């Protein structure tokens, strides 16, 4: 999965997919009442990027729905996965469940079109704080109570705080999550970060009793770092330059071992090295 980083304006969906992304990451900010409000990152952000592009969250979802609904004039067949980077640090811990409920309602209405031929992309809810695990339970409860538990088949999870892998596993237990787990590791492109924790995450994925299904590394903009991440066995790379990742995947060393995921590739299925 080539994951376009910080895609927060509807116009950027086309831009990143046309550069080679089959997945995008979108920032979601919340208001004081835990309603998802904007797709917005703000300052500071990655070096070389504009930090302030934004849409109203529900409007972004409508644009995203068009981009992922077969037959729509804006449809991109290869856009198959969306990571919502949920900026919950603005909330109190006890608002996490509400944030999940409100997020589910927004997605149900504006992305899934109330279960009636909505967008088809798989969705990863990426949460920065382990203490906010009730966002997951609130989300699940709402889809169930609204009569669409089947949409949970399209939803996966990530805790993005670079926490100890054992602590993440315990948190998923509390949230009742037993699959659909992506594990991120990374840092802003302005700084360097080694691959130690990525290797631990890959080892967990490849073990017989691990909780991780997929591992992705962020934010990678250079060819050398891309090669290092691929050598470590990641499933996804988040980038500001999808074309760079696509170029490296075309190199003879990687062409035989990796391919770009399509809609038929289940993002919740573990593919071991």
Curated annotation (Swiss-Prot):
Tissue expression from the record: Expressed by the venom gland.
Keyword terms of this UniProt record: Cytolysis, Dermonecrotic toxin, Disulfide bond, Glycoprotein, Hemolysis, Lipid degradation, Lipid metabolism, Lyase, Magnesium, Metal-binding, Secreted, Toxin
Protein name, per record: Dermonecrotic toxin LdSicTox-alphaIB1aii
Catalytic activity: an N-(acyl)-sphingosylphosphocholine = an N-(acyl)-sphingosyl-1,3-cyclic phosphate + choline; an N-(acyl)-sphingosylphosphoethanolamine = an N-(acyl)-sphingosyl-1,3-cyclic phosphate + ethanolamine; a 1-acyl-sn-glycero-3-phosphocholine = a 1-acyl-sn-glycero-2,3-cyclic phosphate + choline; a 1-acyl-sn-glycero-3-phosphoethanolamine = a 1-acyl-sn-glycero-2,3-cyclic phosphate + ethanolamine
Top-level taxon of origin: Eukaryota
UniProt cross-references to SUPFAM superfamilies, sorted A to Z: PLC-like phosphodiesterases (SSF51695)
Disulphide bond pairs: 45-51, 47-190
Classification of source organism: Eukaryota, Metazoa, Ecdysozoa, Arthropoda, Chelicerata
Binding site for Mg(2+): 25, 27, 85
Positions of the catalytic residues: 5, 41
Originating species: Loxosceles deserta (Desert recluse spider)
Residues glycosylated per entry: 250
Enzyme Commission number(s) of this protein: 4.6.1.-
Family: Belongs to the arthropod phospholipase D family. Class II subfamily.
GO cellular component terms attached to this protein's record: extracellular region
Cofactor binding note from Swiss-Prot or TrEMBL: Binds 1 Mg(2+) ion per subunit.
Enzyme class, UniProt record, top EC level: lyase
UniProt record, GO biological process: killing of cells of another organism; lipid catabolic process
Listed cofactors: Mg(2+)
Compartments it resides in: Secreted
Biological role: Dermonecrotic toxins cleave the phosphodiester linkage between the phosphate and headgroup of certain phospholipids (sphingolipid and lysolipid substrates), forming an alcohol (often choline) and a cyclic phosphate. This toxin acts on sphingomyelin (SM). It may also act on ceramide phosphoethanolamine (CPE), lysophosphatidylcholine (LPC) and lysophosphatidylethanolamine (LPE), but not on lysophosphatidylserine (LPS), and lysophosphatidylglycerol (LPG). It acts by transphosphatidylation, releasing exclusively cyclic phosphate products as second products.
InterPro entries: PLC-like_Pdiesterase_TIM-brl
Molecular-function GO terms, alphabetical: lyase activity; metal ion binding; phosphoric diester hydrolase activity; toxin activity
